[in-house]
């Protein structure tokens, strides 16, 4: 038996649309992500458990886990009869890499179960392919940090897919999911097909500056440069009151904030735990729309996916 945990992640991290992603873990030590258990069986079987298992498709062949299993078997050219348990603890369409959690956990679990026929690069490529089939385009800004941990710079080069970027150890990342859903495909469709040259240059300048500030450990400069000129101006239509919320948490003391992935989760950053707790309390009171929503104060998760049992 193999049991794997895969953490939630923040896609884009503001300034890096489809280029940056960060794995997160609550500071209280709890695990925010999905679990996948693989056992030997005489045929494929899938059991869905967890808080959000009722949101998964009833048809097994529409489940991400089945798609991962099939693609893995096709890749290694072997039919592996297994029983898989998915503990779906991440809300679907939340902007926290929910699909990436299931994809990464399943593919790593299958690879471990089969004595690692695929290397890490081959696995990551497979993860990106499955993510692309679900969201409409291959992108690694959730699967890479979920798999590798930390803050990842997505290069998508033929030899190097992703590189780890230094982060700031004293940053608290507050993530707030309101309890609603924004499908990734819908959030991508709302974006323009073309951008002005000036916009592209400005975004490139800020992204380059953020990478430089991360390596030179200038937290205030990095926070100031975490601005999204590519997706946020258009996706705010999908997030009612987003600009109001962003302004309020800035007044409380957030040094940066933005939309996590496609939303509706938002993230904010503080370098002070007391301020982080105040932001968390305000978001809990004002951003959550139902009882399933949540707010977590997190660190970046440097471990990424890991074996639990």
From Swiss-Prot:
Positions annotated to bind ATP = 91-101
InterPro entries named in the record? GHMP_kinase_C_dom (IPR013750), GHMP_kinase_C_sf (IPR036554), GHMP_kinase_N_dom (IPR006204), GHMP_knse_ATP-bd_CS (IPR006203), Homoserine_kinase (IPR000870), Ribosomal_Su5_D2-typ_SF (IPR020568), Ribsml_uS5_D2-typ_fold_subgr (IPR014721)
Keyword Cell division listed? The answer is: no
Localisation: Cytoplasm
Q: In which pathway does it act?
A: Amino-acid biosynthesis; L-threonine biosynthesis; L-threonine from L-aspartate: step 4/5
- Keywords, comma-separated and alphabetical: Amino-acid biosynthesis, ATP-binding, Cytoplasm, Kinase, Nucleotide-binding, Threonine biosynthesis, Transferase
A GO cellular component term found in this entry reads: cytoplasm
Pfam family name, one = GHMP_kinases_N
User: Can you cite a GO biological process for this protein?
Assistant: threonine biosynthetic process
Q: What is the E.C. number?
A: 2.7.1.39
Listed under catalytic activity are:
L-homoserine + ATP = O-phospho-L-homoserine + ADP + H(+)
Q: Name one GO molecular function term.
A: homoserine kinase activity
Q: Enumerate the NCBIfam families for this protein.
A: PRK01212.1-4 (NF002288), thrB (TIGR00191)
Q: Sum up the protein's function in the record's words.
A: Catalyzes the ATP-dependent phosphorylation of L-homoserine to L-homoserine phosphate.
Question: What family does this chain come from, according to its entry?
Answer: Belongs to the GHMP kinase family. Homoserine kinase subfamily.
Q: What is this protein called?
A: Homoserine kinase
Question: From which organism does this entry originate?
Answer: Buchnera aphidicola subsp. Acyrthosiphon pisum (strain Tuc7)
């Amino acid at each position: 038996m193999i049991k794997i945990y895969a953490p939630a992640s923040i896609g884009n991290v503001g300034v890096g649309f489809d280029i940056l992603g960060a794995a997160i873990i609550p500071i209280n030590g709890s695990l925010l992500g999905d679990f996948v258990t693989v056992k030997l069986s005489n045929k494929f079987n899938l059991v869905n458990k967890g808080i959000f298992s009722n949101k998964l498709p009833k048809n097994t062949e529409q489940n991400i886990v089945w798609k991962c299993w099939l693609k893995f078997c096709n890749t290694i050219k072997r039919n592996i009869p297994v029983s898989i348990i998915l503990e779906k603890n991440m809300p679907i369409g939340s902007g926290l890499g929910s699909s990436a959690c299931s994809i990464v956990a399943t593919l790593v679990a299958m690879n471990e179960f089969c004595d690692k026929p695929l290397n890490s690069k081959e696995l990551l490529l497979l993860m990106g392919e499955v993510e692309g089939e679900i969201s409409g385009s291959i992108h690694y800004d959730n699967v890479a940090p979920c798999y590798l941990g930390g803050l990842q710079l997505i290069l998508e080069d033929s030899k190097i897919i992703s590189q780890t970027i230094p982060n700031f150890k004293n940053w608290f990342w507050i993530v707030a999911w309101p309890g609603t859903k924004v499908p990734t495909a819908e959030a991508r469709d709302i974006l323009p097909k073309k951008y002005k040259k000036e916009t592209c240059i400005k975004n490139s300048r800020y992204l380059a500056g953020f990478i430089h500030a991360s390596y030179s450990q200038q937290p205030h400069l990095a926070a100031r440069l975490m601005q999204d000129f590519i997706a946020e101006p258009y996706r705010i239509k999908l997030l009612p009151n987003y600009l109001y919320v962003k302004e309020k948490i800035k007044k409380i003391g957030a040094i940066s904030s933005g939309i996590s992935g496609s939303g509706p989760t938002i993230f904010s950053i503080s370098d002070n735990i007391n301020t982080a707790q105040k932001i968390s309390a305000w978001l809990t009171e004002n951003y959550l729309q139902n009882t399933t929503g949540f707010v977590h104060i997190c660190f970046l998760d440097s471990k990424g996916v890991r074996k639990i049992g």
